[in-house]
Amino acid sequence: YGLNLHDSITLGRIFSIHYFEYMSDFSFEGESHNFWEFVCVDKGEVDVTRGKNHTILKKGDLVFHKPNEFHNVNATGHIAPNLVVISFECHDDAMYFFNDRILRIDETERNLLADIIIEARRCFDCRLDDPYLQNMPLKDSDVFGAQQMIKLYLQHFLIHLIRRYSNPVVLPKKLLKTEAPKATKSKSDAEVFNRVTDYLESHLTTHVTIDQI
């Protein structure tokens, strides 16, 4: 009686969640480790090394580093890039989908990454903009459910990517131009407001520009 639902992707430990702006001349010596890591470019461009391969990633590009793959990242010297870097443990076969692939994120996936960063600020007692930080201590009292939401958003992010690239949907041009229903737009506006509020709360001690918001 009842069903035990199957998890297609099961996450273990979270090792790092970072969002930071590199200097335009930043250079990292590289590393390898026995867990997954991905790098997503939110602004600018970077030169990423995967094993012996070099690739220039631009805004919206996403690259996965499989366990034990040597990798590093360097700014190109032109634009100071903003990056999301998340590393985590996962042993599911579904993760082989990401081997040696460079992907482009869509708006849903971009929002999921933003949600992960927001929840990380709610539960980790450290800065998220230190690329060399290896230990992420938890706050003594974090927001209820923040740790679980990180896991859920990250699972959603990975599943959404696999689904979208495995079964691409081509929408008719007419549908693409159709204005969103008012109910949908209202929900979207509320979500944007909440996200801006969260951002401002996490930057109370810094000068925030309109472009950043």
Model regions: which residues?
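Generic protein-terminus/edge-of-domain signal
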Residues: 1-62, 68-69, 76-77, 96-97, ...
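N-terminal intrinsically disordered/low-complexity leader segments
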Residues: 1-8, 18, 169-182
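A generic "structured core" feature
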Residues: 36, 49-50, 57, 64-66, ...
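Short, locally clustered residues in the helix-turn-helix/winged-helix DNA-binding domain
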Residues: 42, 87, 117, 162, ...
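A short hydrophobic beta-strand segment most commonly corresponding to one strand
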Residues: 64, 78-96
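An amphipathic alpha-helical interaction segment
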Residues: 86, 107-180
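Double-stranded beta-helix
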Residues: 90-111
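A short, Lys/Arg-enriched amphipathic alpha-helix from helix-turn-helix/homeodomain DNA-binding modules
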Residues: 171-213
